Amino acid sequence: MTTAAMVKPSKPWQASPRQRFNSALVYIAAIVASYVIVAITPMKGKLAYAFVFFVAFIVFDFTLNLFSRGFPVAKDAIARAIVAAGICVAVFPILSIIATVIIRGYHGLHIGLFTHDMALNSVTDPVNQGGLLHALTGTAILVLVALILSVPLGILTAIYMTEIRGRFMKPIKFLVQAMSGVPSIVAGLFILSAVVYPITKGYSGFVGSLALSILMIPTVARTSEEVLLLIPNDLREAGVALGGTHWRTVAMVVVPAARSGLVTAMILGVARIAGETAPILLLTGGGDKVNGDPFHGPMGSLPFYIWKSYSVGTPESITRAWAAILVLLAIVLVLFVSARLLSERRSSK
Amino acid sequence: MSDEMTTERGPGLVSSLGDVARRRFESKSVTTPVQGVGLEARGIHAWFGDRMVLEDMSLDFWSGTVTALIGPSGCGKSTFIRTLNRMHEFIPGAAMAGQVLLNGEDIYSSGTDVTKIRLKIGMVFQKPNPFPSMTISENVLAGLKLAQLKVDNKDDLLEECLERAGLWNEVKDRLSSYGGSLSGGQQQRLCIARSLAVRPEVLLMDEPCSALDPGSTLRIEETISHLAASMTIIIVTHNMQQAARVSDYTAFLLSDGGPGKMVEFGPTGEIFSRPKDIRTENYVTGRFG
């Protein structure tokens, strides 16, 4: 037997049982303190408990560390507690939203959602009648058309900003950043006044996609720009040194090297617009029937369906709205997770 | 380290590097005759913004020879080598003066197709940079696609280039795996193979071994020796042993805080055993730099 087999792996930097006991004591003391203080003062409600617990925890933790390990460690403990509290404040609403959507939405889920539209039903019918098909196809078509319009434009803008670096690079960069903050209703109103009133004079999916593109292009352009900036300059030089023109080097070396990142940019753009409601309300006109033609007639979509069902206000229609929210949330979640998986695969390479 | 020690060590090192260079010279002079001037630099100056980084470099690079550029960091070696295939102009704020003649024609004269120049004067970079989105064979043949060249038999060219770069035996069974899966030394030889595929007359190497281990360095030096018979090679190196092992001629560059200048140029054996300039001697013996 070798000596290596007899030596046990240990982690001397971990907290000793005594230290763990002490920190458990701090938690218990803080909980007790929060109960006592809320009981004897006029403060009321869950928020009061959370707040008092937080303050009490900081005080006890600071005191414990001050006496056992000194002032610098105690200061460190305060910073750690504040950061942890910040994370809780940020994460709690998100978890709460997801939980609410799941709890209220799953009653409305049934297989018919994906096979029927609402052409023969009204939103006040029983929940198991009718479905989301028109809204799903509508959202798919709206997003697809917006994707076709904005991905080439967004990526070309990013290439202008990172590869060509022309004279207008700075103003375009500024514009793209400013555009990504444009309220979606403004995009909708712009298309309404610039395209719908003078030209098409009616609802259609296509004009909705135009408005969505206005929102999507900045997202795609900014994310693509970040991805292209990560490509090492060595590769550009290698391409040019092999006798490639600037454009061929960009098209054959830089863009393929950034491929998975550009796909991520695309998916983030889609996730940005899939749930957009304001321009859709103005431009596509809703509709309860599956409409496969983006250029003519009103087109349903998930956000529109949610808005319409909720505004009716009967128990059935509200259940429908929550089910549709759940479906929309699931779609966006799938998009984000796939974007994350793709970008992780890139960084591990 | 005390002065006496360096003085004691100095001459020993000079003669051993000189020996290395002489052995190489003797083994080579029998087999490969010098074929005439391939590339000439005439009064090259270079600037970044207002700062002059290189002053009045004039050098002839003979076909079929290896020329080493040595000197401390920041003396303008890399800048000089990048002016030779017009990669210098890629850096924002770069400017230059002088002429670079390839077969008697100035590569900077107006109307010159710069992509054609870079096809004839290839370059290998300091860090191995295979294209990550391409397989090994696609990497080798990337130059053909980038420059839109046609060849009759791609497989033959692929094998020939990898063979000349000394990589064929190691990768012939996995030509369709990605370039990034190779080791650093193999990646660098892949980059050499990639430069060879467009059949350059001149190959510029900017510290090609500085990121590699000694074994890979040795393989690349062997590759350089094989290639030297058929082309002009110019290599920037910080490793004086390497300069002595692979080069026929050596140029020593130095910057005294201002722009880099050429201090001495001559056959490698002379530079390492009987340098004319005291600064060269100090540098090659390791007394400074």
Residue ranges with predicted function:
Chain A
Residues 46-57, 129-160:
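Transmembrane alpha-helix signature in integral membrane proteins
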Residues 62, 228-229, 240, 264-267, ...:
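C-terminal transmembrane helix and the adjacent membrane-cytosol boundary/short C-terminal tail
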Residues 64-72, 146-176, 189, 340-345:
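Transmembrane-helix boundary motif in ABC transporter permease subunits
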Residues 147-166, 170-173, 204-241, 245-253, ...:
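Membrane-cytosol interface at the C-terminal ends of specific transmembrane alpha-helices
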Residues 177-212:
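Generic hydrophobic transmembrane alpha-helix motif, especially the helices
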Residues 246-284:
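Transmembrane alpha-helices
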